[in-house]
């Protein structure tokens, strides 16, 4: 099943990069990424451009939709992303979320015409968020309770919705 992954970003290249790392590790291969940029500068564009070739090698298209920074207009650029998406199934996330490798596979497996599939997020501490490196996403270590506790998340993470 072909999916379009849409998310917004604004002047957060560090978190955008981590979001793209998570999407790069997806076990489901039939998707495109549409980044809805609400007026970020050149650093954001550079992150997208740097990773675009890696996605292309997997057959995944990454499109960067940009609008000038004229204040908070996130909804406008997301609406444009919806219009420009090429699949009939849209998956929304955020530009600071790191998706588990099975995120899109679960969406594809559970998709049902006429229904919405809703998920949630788990807010990490700033220490844990900063500690996430590409290798942690590649190996999925950043979703392991031991890694999370070692990086400032505390004991409650074992019972969280983040881990299986």
Residues covered by each model-derived region:
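Short alpha-helix within the catalytic core of nucleotide-sugar-dependent glycosyltransferases
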Residues: 20-21, 45, 87, 101-112
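Short aromatic/hydrophobic "clamp" motif used to bind/position activated sugar donors
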Residues: 90
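Short, acidic, metal-binding catalytic loop of nucleotide-sugar glycosyltransferases
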Residues: 21-30
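Conserved donor NDP-sugar-binding/catalytic core segment of glycosyltransferases
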Residues: 102-140, 148
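Glycine-rich, basic loop-to-helix element that forms the pyrophosphate-binding segment
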Residues: 68-85, 102
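Cell-envelope/extracellular polymer assembly enzymes that use nucleotide-activated donors
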Residues: 2-4, 32
């Amino acid at each position: 099943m072909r999916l379009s992954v849409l998310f917004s970003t604004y002047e957060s290249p560090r978190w955008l990069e981590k979001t793209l790392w998570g999407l790069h590790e997806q076990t489901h291969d039939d998707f495109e990424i549409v980044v809805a940029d609400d007026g970020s500068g050149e650093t954001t564009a550079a992150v997208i451009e740097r990773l675009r070739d890696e996605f292309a090698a997997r057959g995944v298209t990454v499109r960067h939709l940009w609008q000038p920074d004229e204040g908070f207009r996130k909804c406008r650029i997301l609406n444009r992303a919806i219009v420009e998406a090429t699949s009939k199934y849209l998956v929304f996330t955020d530009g600071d979320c790191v998706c588990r490798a099975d995120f899109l596979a679960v969406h594809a497996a559970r998709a049902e015409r006429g229904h919405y599939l809703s998920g949630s997020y788990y807010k990490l501490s700033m220490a844990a968020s900063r500690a996430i490196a590409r290798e942690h996403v590649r190996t999925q270590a950043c979703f392991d309770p031991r890694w999370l506790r070692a990086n400032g998340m505390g004991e409650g993470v074992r019972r969280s919705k983040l881990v299986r």
